[in-house]
Amino acid sequence: MSVNRILVINPGSTSTKIGVFDNERPVLEETIRHDEEQIGKYKRIIDQYEFRKETILEVLHSHGINISKLNAVCGRGGLLRPIEGGTYTVNDAMLEDLKNGFSGHHASNLGGILAYEIASGLNIPAFIVDPVVVDEMEPIARISGIAGMERKSIFHALNQKAVARKVAEELNHKYEDLNLLVTHMGGGITVGAHKKGKVIDVNNGLNGEGPFSPERAGTVPVGQLVEMCFSGEYYRDEMVKKLVGQGGLVSLIGTNDAIKVEQMVEKGDPEATLIYKAMAYQVAKEIGGASAVLHGKIDAIVLTGGLAYSKILVDEIKERVDWIADVIVHPGEDELQALAEGALRVLREEEAPKEYIVREKETVARG
C-alpha cells in the first residue's frame, strides 16, 4: 500500500496543534504554545496566520520533517456557511468566508487558511474536514414553535462522524449503511441521530439546547429565562455566559471539572450525586428522543468525548438507554487523527472531495 504523508493543523486560541501522519500512523504530534503577548499584537485573529505559518514550518524543520514529501495538508474547519459533512478542498470562496468571518471569528478559521498557504507552495491539495457548521438536518427537524426561529445544527461534527466511522468498521459495516445515535460528552454535550451517514437531527450544544454539561446550561425553562433576561439585573453578555461558559456544573456546583465532581460523588456528597445523576438523566433523555427520530431502528448507541471516561456517568446513562440498542463507548477525542483520516479517504479515492460553492448567499456542497 502506498504511503500518503499528511500534515494536519488544528489552531486554538493560544496554541496550534499539528500532526504529521503516514496514512493513519502518526509520525509527529505536537502542541505549539503561542506567547499571549505575541498573539496580542494582532487586532484580528485572522491576522495571525503568517506568524502561525512560520512557527509551524520552524517546528517541522526542527523535527527533521521534509515538507516536500507531503501529499496533502488538512486544517480544522472554521465557521463557514452551513454545509454537509465530508472532506472539502480549500478554495477561494472558502478562504474569503474564513477571512471575513462569515459565521463568526474563531481561531479554527485559521485552519483552512494555514492549510492552503502551506499546500499551495508545494502544489499539493489543502482540505478541511467536518467543521462545526456541518448541517444535514431534515426540514422537519428545523421547525420550532416560533415563526422565523429555526433550529440550527451546531455540534461536535468532526469527532461524532470520526467515531461513527470507527464503530461502523468494528461492526463490519459502512457508516453510510447504519443508523447510530452518537453522543459527544465534553465541555458541551451533543446527541446526533446519524441516519445512513447523515446527521439528520442534533441538539445545538452551543446555544442552549439539550442536556446541561460541565459548562453549558442546555435546555432551561424558557419562561423563567425570559423573566431573568428582562429583570434589569443582567447585561446581555452576562446572560450569554449563563448559557455557555458559566452554566451546567459550573452554575450548579461551582466547577467544570467532572473529575472533581466524580470524586465528590464517590465520597458520598448528596448534592454532587444528585447533580451528576441529573446530567446523566438528561443525556439519556436526549438519546431517547433521538431514537424516535430514527423510528427506533438503531444499530448502536455511541458514547464519546472526555466525559465518556467517567464510569459513573456512563453506567448511569447505560441503565436508562441500553434497552434501545447496544451501547458502545469510545472515550476521548482525537481531532488530529480524524482530520488525517478525512484527507486520507480522499487521497485513496474512497470518497470524492467536496467543493465549497457560494451562490446567491447560499452554500452548495458539490461532491
UniProtKB/Swiss-Prot annotation:
Name recorded for this polypeptide: Probable butyrate kinase
Organism whose genome encodes this protein: Bacillus anthracis
Keyword Kinase appears in the UniProt entry: yes
A GO BP annotation: acetate metabolic process
Transmembrane regions: none
CDD domains linked: ASKHA_NBD_BK
Record-level GO cellular component terms: cytoplasm
Pfam families registered for this protein in UniProt: Acetate_kinase (PF00871)
The family this protein is said to belong to: Belongs to the acetokinase family.
Catalytic activity: butanoate + ATP = butanoyl phosphate + ADP
Annotated InterPro entries: Aliphatic_acid_kin_short-chain, Aliphatic_acid_kinase_CS, ATPase_NBD, Butyrate_kin
A single MF term (Gene Ontology): butyrate kinase activity
Broad class of the protein's primary localization: cytoplasm
Subcellular location: Cytoplasm
EC numbers on record: 2.7.2.7
Keywords: ATP-binding, Cytoplasm, Kinase, Nucleotide-binding, Transferase
